[in-house]
Amino acid sequence: MSVMKIPGHVNQKPGEVMLEEIENLLGDCKRCELGQTRSHLVFGTGDPHARVMFVGEGPGKNEDLKGEPFVGAAGKKLDSLLSIAGLTREEIYIANVVKCRPPGNRNPKPDEIEACSPFLREQIRSVWPDVIVCLGNFASQWVLKTDRGVTQLRGKLYQQGHFVVAPTFHPAACIYHSDWQPLLEEDLARVGAWLAANPRGEVTAAAATAHNVRPVADAAGKKTPAGAGLPEEAAR
């Protein structure tokens, strides 16, 4: 699926399409069945020029009620761990693969992910972060265009054009699997080390080598999820 074109902004460069315009284009979205059952569409929030963008799976009950991402228990868990990467909530941008809560917190369906994909892709294109932290299976598989699970993907950084991608566990999973939290902390520390060594605007190929950043091909699986993938400019 190609980059979605915002009306009136077909020649915009990365970082020039405003998040507000993308949200307005979403409107009262009914592009899939989730639009019939949600309370609120949950677009995304945070610093529109963040160096680090977090991508989760989808809204939970609290997020659906408030219309904001990561405001429930998983959000509190994430907030408590951000300092490991040298970050605060105010310094990041955060969004989800799907914008509406799947009923009963079930997994999002392929057609639901595909319906939301152009909008997530444009959010990434607007923020144009240096690092994308993928929280859980669905975010990791979408960004890295693979069917491999996060347990196989985590523990490494991947280079995808402009972006460094860090797959890790979803903080909600760590609430129920406490033995996964040290691994999430390890992954966030890896992100923090990369950020400290690579000031914005000074990222080099040598830095990627020094931090053992893997080519995105190392994440490849047997199947690409429907609608998955970063903006086309990422490969340039």
Model regions and ranges:
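A polyanion-binding, active-site-adjacent surface
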Residues: 2-236
